[in-house]
């Protein structure tokens, strides 16, 4: 978990979110962003998908956590940014978004969470 002060506000980012919807509600009530890695694509990730389902569109982030937490199509292999589209597509499908909407929403969220371009 990461928290930092920006413009007199505290930004909370739950990295590699791997908990259930109950904890997600608590985090979201405090303004947290939930960041999902490739593990959300695993068959066993039901609780993570429940958390994704309740998160507001503008509080969802995506990450690789490379070289670990590789998405399902390549599970067990070395992870990297080149596999991020698998996770983005999975999140898009879960949210009912097309790929363009997912890319735009997740990009906008990253700018909001991290304060703009790096």
Regions found by a protein language model. Give the residues of each.
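Active-site metal-binding loops of divalent metal-dependent hydrolases
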Residues: 16, 32, 39-40, 66-67
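Structural detector of well-ordered beta-strand residues that form the stable sheet scaffold
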Residues: 13-15, 35, 61-63
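Mid-to-C-terminal alpha-helical segments outside catalytic/metal-binding sites
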Residues: 82-118
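Glycine-enriched alpha-helix->loop->beta-strand junction motifs that scaffold or abut catalytic
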Residues: 9, 23-37, 56-59
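Short acidic/histidine-rich active-site segments
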Residues: 58-80
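Conserved, mostly hydrophobic/aromatic
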Residues: 15, 27, 52, 65, ...
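Single conserved hydrophobic/aromatic residue that forms the stacking wall/gate
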Residues: 1-12
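Active-site glycine- and acidic-residue-rich loops that bind
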Residues: 35-50
């Amino acid at each position: 978990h990461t928290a930092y002060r920006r413009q007199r506000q505290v930004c909370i980012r739950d990295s590699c979110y791997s908990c259930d919807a109950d904890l997600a509600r608590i985090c979201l009530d405090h303004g947290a962003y939930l960041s999902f890695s490739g593990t959300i694509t695993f068959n066993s990730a039901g609780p993570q998908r429940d958390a994704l389902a309740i998160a507001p569109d503008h509080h969802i982030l995506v990450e690789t956590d490379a070289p670990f937490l590789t998405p399902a199509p390549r599970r067990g292999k070395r992870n990297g940014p080149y596999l991020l589209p698998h996770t983005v597509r999975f999140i898009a499908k879960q949210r009912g978004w097309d790929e363009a909407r997912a890319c735009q929403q997740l990009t906008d969220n990253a700018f909001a969470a991290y304060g703009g371009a790096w």
